[in-house]
Amino acid sequence: SDDKCQGRPMYGCREDDDSVFGWTYDSNHGQCWKGSYCKHRRQPSNYFASQQECRNTCGA
């Protein structure tokens, strides 16, 4: 499986105006979840623009 899928899942940014939404893979559950990260931080490796991209990459 892809290294992107093994990264720590992104859980969300608490500051709403700073949030970038996307999808993340949770290897514990084997599923793609909707999540977000804070714009002022680096984009997490476990970030996908769409649910389809997440599923295709991680086989969820």
Curated annotation (Swiss-Prot):
Expressed in salivary glands. Signal peptide: none annotated. InterPro entries: Kunitz_BPTI_sf. It is found in: Secreted. One of its GO terms (molecular function) is serine-type endopeptidase inhibitor activity. Keywords: Cell adhesion impairing toxin, Hemostasis impairing toxin, Platelet aggregation inhibiting toxin, Secreted, Toxin. A motif (Cell attachment site) lies at residues 14-16. Its main location: secreted. One of its GO terms (cellular component) is extracellular region. Gene3D superfamilies: Pancreatic trypsin inhibitor Kunitz domain (4.10.410.10). Tick salivary platelet aggregation inhibitor that plays an important part in the anti-hemostatic strategy of ticks. Inhibits fibrinogen interaction with platelets. Acts by binding (in a divalent metal ion dependent manner) to the glycoprotein IIb-IIIa receptor (ITGA2B/ITGB3) on the platelet surface and inhibits aggregation induced by ADP (IC(50)=99-104 nM), thrombin, collagen (IC(50)=64 nM) platelet-activating factor and collagen. Interacts to unstimulated platelets (Kd=42.5 nM) and to ADP-stimulated platelets (Kd=39.4 nM). This is Disagregin. It comes from Ornithodoros moubata (Soft tick).
